[in-house]
């Protein structure tokens, strides 16, 4: 986290996936004393807020109700965040360090993150925490919202561990990685350790994971592919291709992350998006000094044939995660990526 910057967590997960319980577990920890919470519910009665407030009313909390934060009450969200940041803290409490937004179970993270652009002056460090209900597994993948939530997440926490089988917990990392190989997976028995990791400091994202050759997408509409530059790329061509990719896929683009070496820079550029919202590209020093170029793309209802013609055409060749090569795995071990800001 940048000096003085507030950490902003978007807590995302499908209906009934355990978001409120996960948040409540965290708020019961001493480390949560410097936290403010925003709860968004689609409806006039904020039940989750009542549940979270049960047991104490010292927590700074704001309710956004009667509308989904990702599509209906964006201006209210920005106003609420700004109000929490500038508000005077109660005497004896630590400075505000962290804001957690618990979205409704139907909210997609991409539009939510886009609404934070007006708050750039606060220089917040932002990450999406997703929930994975062990008792339901990938059953909710039939819902577009659930797939979008998992794909956008930087961290995915397994929930309802006490209700799930031992096999469900042990298989969770592989199952989640097949949906979003870019996410840090949190599948722990201890609830305190789970929340400490889920809402832990945003100093740097973990390296891109080492995906083994037997990883397969768990949902037939989900596409996990890798784009490699065919030759040296200029920055204008890269920017145009990314812009056209976002335009061509629209909401079908769920997540993108990787490194691209451009002609005029010594270090590769870190490229990252949640949905069609791209973070500013930034040079990234590789741990071993190597220069690598590839983009991981997570999308749904997309055929590889759609990607090739995107202009400027011929910049990338595409391969599936089902057959990752050793060089790609080595590259992903040494990346020191940064969180979306």
For every predicted segment, state its role.
Residues 152-287, 301-341:
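C-terminal accessory "lid"/substrate-recognition subdomains
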Residues 140-152, 158:
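Flexible active-site lid/hinge loop adjacent to a nucleotide/diphosphate
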Residues 117-126, 147-150, 173-180:
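A short alpha->loop->secondary-structure connector
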Residues 97, 221-225, 293-295:
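Short amphipathic alpha-helical segments
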Residues 2-12, 17-140:
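Nucleotide-state-sensitive switch-loop elements of NTP-binding domains
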Residues 38-40, 130-133, 157-160, 227-228, ...:
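Conserved beta-strand segments of the P-loop GTPase G domain that flank and frequently precede/overlap
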Residues 285-296:
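Short, surface-exposed secondary-structure junctions/capping segments
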Residues 3, 7, 34, 73-76, ...:
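Helical mechanochemical/support elements of P-loop NTPase systems and associated helical scaffolds
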